[in-house]
Amino acid sequence: MKPPHAVSRFIFLLALLPVPAVHAAELTQNRDPESGLLAWKKVDRGFSLQLIQLLPEYVAAVYSSRNLPPAVVDSMRGYCVFGSVVQNQSGGTLDYRVADWRAVTPDGKQHRLKTKPEWVAEWKTLGSDFGWSILPATASFDTGDWAQGFTTIQLPPGSHFDLLYSWRHHGKRYRGKMENLACAPDQPPLAP
């Protein structure tokens, strides 16, 4: 058995070793002072995801202003739409796949996000190919690279949910959660 002072010294030396920082990703929320709309951002292990509420009338205006068939504009109704920005802040290659992401409503039900290929296939049947507006369904990108576009969930305006998402970094899959998100209201909120 080691003498008591040797054990104490060992414990003391262990206490001096650097402890790796425990990673705690923080969700930030901001309210636009002019529109009253909300935006959320979370950076977790170098994967940055930002979601910005978009009013249904704004989304309709974006598609209408491109002289797209009315059926394309109407296809977006009934969807909760966010302006989305994904950025790699990791120092290595990241990739993601929107088809793996889910919105979980307070009743526990999981809702798929509609992906860019699904929208493009639907819009082609309606006489349009306007896929550039939707967040790429998959991406693999280096440090500093980013992707942006609309993300869509078939939920009514004002719906609340948590977003479960995932990404890969150095071949390892990570999962994240953005809690207490809300679809934009049907009408603009009153500015505070």
Model region roles, listed by residue range:
Residues 1-7:
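N-terminal secretory signal peptides that target proteins for export/translocation
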Residues 9-19:
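Bacterial N-terminal signal peptides
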Residues 24-192:
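Conserved functional micro-motifs across diverse proteins
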